[in-house]
Design a protein with these regions (language model features):
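Short beta-strand scaffold segments in enzyme catalytic cores
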Residues: 13-19, 135-137, 143-147
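Short glycine-rich phosphate-binding loop at a beta-alpha junction
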Residues: 73-83, 285-296, 317-320
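Conserved phosphate-binding catalytic cores of ATP/NTP-utilizing and phosphoryl-transfer enzymes
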Residues: 112-134
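N-terminal beta-alpha supersecondary unit
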Residues: 2-85, 114
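Glycine-rich phosphate-binding/hydrolytic loop that grips phosphoryl groups
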Residues: 320-357
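A contiguous, well-structured pocket-lining segment that forms one wall/lid of small-molecule binding clefts
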Residues: 30, 72, 188-289, 298-312, ...
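Conserved phosphate-binding/catalytic loops in two-lobed NTP-binding clefts
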Residues: 111-112, 289, 306-331
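Glycine-rich phosphate-binding loop plus the immediately following alpha-helix
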Residues: 127, 150-197, 239-240, 244-250
């Protein structure tokens, strides 16, 4: 089966051609038109601008994806498209374009939930996970833990009660001079801080908690892991405390070591996620773990969650960094399983900004 898939839920327009055989998935093309440079001017995504950019890009990248894959629309067996959640204007561009192609060429169409798509990025791995397993979806808009019972049925077992981890990195990163989106720069600056704090270029994360920098009361930040026994997070408190810390340094006229600050912020965020993932795995014996979403590209989070899984003897599945962000290939993978379940869409398909993962 050859699948053509579209992703346009936020600020990246993607079209991908994926081949599914008895062996598994093969990504034949995965074209992504990024809007980062455009939105960087505003310090974040502007929905109206994002929608217009999707309109300008989607036809071009579709034919580029087909060309790179060496196929035509006549070869396509299935079209998949992200229908929710996301920016409504952005989603509508992808949904309407996909519907038009499907109807005009008599190709079956399936709608895909964006979060399920992120989790499905792991199905593109050579050694792909099989449900049931525990999954983390961490991005600029989501931070949640799921129990994946089957390829199409998942249940939310933990979530953020306010801000997403990626949004907090972007906000705090901007305040210390890291250009939007701050994820990659924050990761690198944190690494610099960890090494500075420990003097170790290899085991810097593991040694950080015993370093003088961690014990510095001027840099104290709260954990976003709620202590109520749930698997939920609250990143707003961490973010607010970090903003107040920055203001204190500014008011006292003291120079802030950006790298040590970034390391402390990253450590608290990552440790909170690690704590909840460990709890989730302990509550679900023998299940493996999938890490997905844009923040899954964070090297410190990847490192720490790998350590957690190994300590519990669980398998961990992490997509390559190239598949952590929004892309069409992950939508194709999930679309395949929606098709097998008979979850076909028709001309009445509409986009929704709301999360309906369950």
């Amino acid at each position: 089966m050859i699948i053509l898939a579209f992703e346009s839920s936020c600020d990246e327009t993607s079209a991908s051609v994926v081949l599914r055989t008895e062996v598994g998935f093969t990504v034949k093309s995965n074209i992504i038109a990024s809007q980062i440079e455009t939105h960087r001017l505003y310090g974040g995504v502007v929905p109206e601008i994002a929608s217009r950019a999707h309109i300008e890009a989607i036809s071009r990248i579709t034919y580029e994806a087909l060309g790179v894959a060496g196929v035509t629309l006549a070869d396509i067996d299935l079209i998949a498209v992200t229908a929710n959640p996301g920016l409504i204007g952005a989603l509508l561009v992808g949904v309407n374009f996909a519907k038009g192609l499907a109807l005009a060429n008599s190709i079956p169409l399936v709608a895909v939930d964006h979060i399920k798509g992120h989790i499905a990025s792991s199905y593109l791995l050579e050694n792909a996970p099989k449900p049931p397993f525990i999954a983390l979806a961490a991005s600029g808009g989501h931070t949640a833990i799921y129990r994946v019972d089957s390829y199409t049925k998942i249940k939310t077992i933990g979530t953020t009660r306010d801000d997403a981890i990626g949004e907090s990195f972007d906000k705090i990163g901007r305040l210390i001079g890291i250009p939007y989106p701050a994820g990659k720069g924050f990761d690198a600056l944190s690494r610099e801080g960890f090494i500075k704090a420990t003097g170790d270029e290899e085991k810097f994360y593991e040694k950080y908690k015993k370093s003088p920098a961690y014990k510095d009361k001027e840099m104290t930040l709260p954990s976003p892991a709620l202590s109520d026994g749930s698997l939920d997070f609250s990143f707003s408190g961490l973010k607010t405390a970090a903003i107040n810390l920055l203001h204190r340094f500014e008011q006292k006229g003291e120079a802030l070591d950006r790298s040590l600050f970034a390391a402390r912020y990253t450590f608290e965020a990552v440790e909170a996620v690690a704590k909840k993932i460990k709890m989730a795995l302990e509550e679900n014996p023998e299940m493996g773990f999938v890490m997905a979403g844009g923040v899954a590209a964070n090297s410190h989070l990847r490192r720490r969650l790998t350590e957690v899984c190994h300590s519990l003897g669980r398998d961990i599945f992490i997509p390559p960094v190239s598949l952590c962000g929004d892309n069409g290939a992950m939508i194709a993978a999930q679309g395949y399983y929606e098709y097998l379940e008979g979850n076909l869409a028709d001309s009445s398909l509409n986009a929704s900004a709301l999360d309906s993962v369950e």
